[in-house]
């Protein structure tokens, strides 16, 4: 779930596909839903798994792209919680500042 700057809590879920690479994790569906509902600024993200698993690399990149520096609370069903920032999850993140403007490309 993600908490928006306005205090609204928005949830998501893991969407499985028989073609595993097309599966979309709950972190991404949560953020995509929030964006689709018009939210663009977030206070925190909570990731709940059975065993306290950390977000995958794709989710870490999307969290960084859409949230920048927010706390990410990772928890399991027994009550264990670990809080990291987006940059701790994805140090030296690749983002739009690493992209050259199109007009500078030799295309």
Where are these regions (language model features)?
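Short, charged low-complexity linear segments at domain edges
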Residues: 24-43
């Amino acid at each position: 779930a993600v908490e928006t700057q306005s205090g609204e809590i928005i949830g998501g879920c893991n969407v499985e596909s028989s073609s595993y690479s097309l599966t979309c994790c709950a972190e991404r569906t949560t953020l995509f839903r929030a964006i689709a509902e018009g939210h663009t600024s977030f206070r925190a993200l909570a990731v709940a798994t059975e065993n306290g698993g950390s977000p995958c690399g794709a989710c870490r990149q999307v969290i960084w792209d859409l949230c920048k520096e927010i706390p990410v609370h990772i928890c399991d069903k027994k009550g264990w919680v670990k809080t990291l920032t987006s940059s701790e999850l994805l140090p030296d993140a690749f983002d739009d500042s690493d992209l050259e403007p199109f007009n500078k490309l030799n295309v």
